[in-house]
Amino acid sequence: MKTYKYYVNSNGRRIKLLVLRPDRHARAFDLTAGVLWIHGGGFATGMAEMVYITRARALVEKFGVTVAAPAYTLSWREPYPAAVEDCYSALLWFKANAWMLGFNADKIIVGGESAGGGLCAALCILARER
């Protein structure tokens, strides 16, 4: 497994995006998915590295997917909708760079746990609306 760090622009903010990729893909490129996994923490705590340690590694190892974990702006730094806008910017970047990252841009899964699950739901609605 390889880990990369990228930075994404989001409404004047620079957010970190951790990307984990398998050493070798278990499936053909057109079948390989990308997963945007959003960390929890009550919108006020937590970091992308939390995902790296737990869920992201498991997803990469078990399913051979590429996982991106955005370090969205926490609520004590800037209120809603900063976090969901950061996740949206991360999603756009992730899709635009799918070829470089080794997955099919038409096969993106968005998920999260706790507050990340709430951001996931808000992000899906935002993406549909835009």
What is the role of each PLM region?
Residues 47-49, 79-80:
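Conserved catalytic-core motifs of eukaryotic protein kinase domains, centered on the activation segment
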Residues 29-41:
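Short beta-strand element of the alpha/beta-hydrolase
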Residues 49-70:
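Short amphipathic alpha-helix adjacent to the substrate-entry channel of hydrolases
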Residues 23, 71-75:
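Short beta-to-alpha linker loops that shape the active-site pocket of alpha/beta-hydrolase fold enzymes
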